[in-house]
């Protein structure tokens, strides 16, 4: 059995990123990460999203946004992890578990957070 390992990565620029929604943030980071691994989006077997406090996004299942941001991943199984300060670690652990068990061969792990909501509508 091969041990799972990280073979590609990317990150966004740091800052408030007010002009980007979650889909744009996912696309702008996931595509370079996949390319960094020498893969195409269609090579991915499972998507693991670490996203704490989805209430800011007004979207409870943010793992589905990966398929909207990257159409080639639309039918790829995706799950969202939420574990307070360890949310990103939980997403990595879940991907490593799926890889190590042989359930999948290639995983995409996305960690994201946007802690700002739009204007209140009354």
Label for each model-derived stretch:
Residues 78-87:
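Active-site nucleophile and cofactor-binding loops and adjacent substrate-binding regions
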Residues 87-94:
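Conserved beta-loop-alpha segment that forms the PLP phosphate-binding cup at the N-terminus of a helix
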Residues 1-78, 97-101, 109-121:
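Conserved "HGTGT" condensation-loop signature of ketosynthase/thiolase-family condensing enzymes
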Residues 106:
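Phosphate-binding/catalytic loop of phosphoryl-transfer enzymes
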């Amino acid at each position: 059995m091969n041990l799972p390992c990280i073979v590609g990565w990317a990150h966004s620029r740091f800052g408030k990123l007010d002009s980007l929604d979650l889909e744009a943030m996912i696309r702008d980071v996931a595509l370079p990460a996949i390319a960094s691994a020498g893969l195409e989006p269609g090579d991915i077997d499972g998507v693991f999203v670490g996203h704490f406090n989805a209430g800011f996004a007004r979207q409870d299942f943010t793992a589905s946004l990966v398929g909207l941001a990257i159409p080639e991943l639309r039918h790829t199984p995706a799950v969202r992890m939420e574990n307070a300060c360890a949310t990103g670690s939980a997403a990595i652990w879940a991907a490593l578990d799926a890889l190590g068990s042989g359930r999948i061969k290639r995983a995409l792990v996305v960690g994201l957070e946007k802690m700002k909501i739009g204007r209140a509508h009354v």
